[in-house]
């Protein structure tokens, strides 16, 4: 048996794994997420390989989605202090780096910030040339503070990234042991949000290096010698090496994988997906089989950013959500991975959301649960209201739309959902997140501002499409499988010359 893929999703409660042969699910497994993460991964992967009778040499690739880096940021855990350099000349001084950050996170991460010569105007003219001497002086100051991660952001570097690239080379020469993140590789237009995303990336670089090494070691522990890919926020894959450099690009991979898996398992490409895990419920919209991306500023751990993220609405409701009888409420706190030990239906002493549906006779596992009928009815109504409200928030119109239920916690939903044309809970719904990881494609995205110089806009669009196609190949896509997924173009009326901004995204199947 050959050409097998393993998909893995590492959540805060469970680690799910799935083994796929083409479009066929051969085996699934769910293991509690372990404190060291790696042993949970190797255990889940080993389980699906054992179930199928496959050999380690049959596995051509492992695709892994994780919330490891997002959780570290939210919990302020394992974060590096960062040196922040802004190439701006005399501009932007009224809005210093990290303005608007939560104070405790800013104090933990922001240990040095310097505004330096450089940057560009909105029309591409230089504000000031880069000053190497000033940059090297800043490097000396950062070395005095023993900083080992640097975030560089230039004004309008999303349009002209060359100064940032030059600054990175200088910093790497002066601080050879430091990680260097530059904003033009991470965010879009919008100085503060792009700078914030770059700082977040920089503070996670040491954790990402250790985590990816641990993930690779978990494969070696079960004798897997195949490439490891990591899921990105937009539902596509990147290499493990790239994930070391850009941990922020994995933040939303959990709900994104679930949505991609829901599309594959249900065969429906346009729908609302409700993904209920042990702790949270995530609701998003599928458009042509891919998660709808948000067009708004995204807050991560209270920090405004502007990188690609799916438009997902989340609340603290899951199978392990704790039920309180005094004020009659459910969540947002959860017993998480201890559900099998603490829930009443498994012999524990904590009333959870799972116990509510067990008391209603909606599930056939565990011990009988004897709860007050009024409490059960009230909590069940609360959960129903939460789901209905979430679905209503993400709908694009008043027209009914299919709703796909996935995740192990989707057993909480046993009622009609307002606005749903139909409700589906596909086979293997509990492993949709891992299926989505295994089915993911690779992508290439190009976002450019071009002066038309008399050319028709269609010619400029074709130029950027070719660049996106090549970017997709560079990311590891099979050339003949590539298709253009999305094109956006807009005139830029504030420029003195005829110009437009064009964004093109291409996706393709992973090359063998």
Regions of interest found by a model, annotated:
Residues 1-512:
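N-terminally biased helix-coil "hinge/interface" segments that flank
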